């Protein structure tokens, strides 16, 4: 990886991390669903006039938008609003990888291999450690935690829709997909 690529990768990590801080601050002034809706409106509304609708079946676009754009962020914003620490939410949200593997096995008949099963076991152990107050010393409201897991599951469902979308097109316009799916909420 070149130095430029490394700096760009670091920038992505910083922006991603700041996203959770901005959510936390924004929730002090606005209800969670309104903040989430505003977030997507600010992305989608001006961009749809410049970016063509992706050439994918409407049902897949709607499914992707409902899971990635609406449900994931509705659950996440509500979780943080109900007391889930933003930093912890960013970690728990990564359970989407576990959910994606499991959904991929059920949806596409993908086979799970030893390394994947070991990763799943490690992920479940990590989630259990995060839940256990005596192990991490941080009180987490169970409702916030469960809403964050629901957000992770929604993200995983979106990943499944994304895989289906990719199979319908030889070269889908990813930016177009993201922008137009943001209209769904």
Language-model region placement:
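Glycine-/small-residue-enriched transmembrane alpha-helix faces in small-molecule transporters
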Residues: 1-34, 139-164, 185
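Small-residue-rich packing faces within the transmembrane alpha-helices of Major Facilitator Superfamily
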Residues: 17, 37, 41-45, 124, ...
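Hydrophobic/aromatic residues within transmembrane alpha-helices
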Residues: 26, 35, 79, 106-108, ...
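Specific transmembrane alpha-helical segments of multi-pass solute transporters/efflux pumps
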Residues: 14-15, 19-20, 48-93, 101, ...
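A helix-boundary/kink motif common to multi-pass secondary transporters
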Residues: 31-32, 84-85, 108-113, 170-173
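Hydrophobic transmembrane alpha-helices of multi-pass small-molecule transport proteins
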Residues: 41, 47, 64, 102-103, ...
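Loop-to-transmembrane alpha-helix entry segments
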Residues: 56-62, 90-93, 109-129, 138-145
């Amino acid at each position: 990886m070149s130095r430029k690529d490394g700096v760009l990768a670091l920038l992505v990590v910083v922006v991603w991390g700041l996203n959770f801080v901005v959510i936390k601050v924004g929730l002090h002034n606005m209800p969670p669903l309104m903040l989430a809706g505003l977030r997507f409106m600010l992305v989608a509304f001006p961009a749809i006039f410049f970016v063509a609708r992706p050439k994918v079946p409407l049902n897949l676009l709607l499914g992707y938008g409902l899971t990635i754009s609406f449900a994931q962020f509705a659950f996440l914003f509500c979780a943080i609003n109900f007391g889930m620490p933003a930093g912890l939410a960013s970690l728990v949200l990564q359970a989407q990888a576990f959910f994606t593997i499991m959904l991929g096995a059920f949806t596409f008949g993908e086979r799970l291999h030893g390394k994947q099963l070991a990763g799943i076991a490690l992920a479940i152990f990590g989630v259990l450690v995060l839940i256990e107050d005596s192990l991490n010393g941080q009180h987490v409201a169970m409702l916030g935690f469960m809403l964050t897991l629901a957000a992770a599951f929604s993200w995983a469902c979106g990943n499944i829709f994304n895989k289906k979308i990719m199979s319908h097109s030889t070269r889908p316009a990813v930016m177009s997909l993201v922008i137009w799916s943001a209209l769904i909420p």
